[in-house]
């Protein structure tokens, strides 16, 4: 996995982002803007904090701690997010559920997203600034492998 480059844009969706309905227009436009600008995706920002990606939940890792936004009306309650956090807890990884800023992303050791279509995908830069050393992080890659293995075990 080579990792994604993301850009940021204001989050212009209404405040019930946990409901998967007509909320898809703005993320679709943001994803298109990212691709046209040479990025892989967009992380949306409200009041200085990351809400989520265009079709994924956002995470950073700092000093071994996984940081992701807490469940609320501000984000979609992703099924991959729920599984990933359970697997991380099973492995005694520390998780903080709270908002985080763009500056925190730039200072993070690692970042990644989760979604049903991409599983766990490392993020290696934001707005042209490398995250960590600019390569997929070891925790993100480990969590990706764990997610795939656990999903295969549970497959019918």
Description of each model-found segment:
Residues 1-156:
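Helix-start/capping segments and mature chain N-termini
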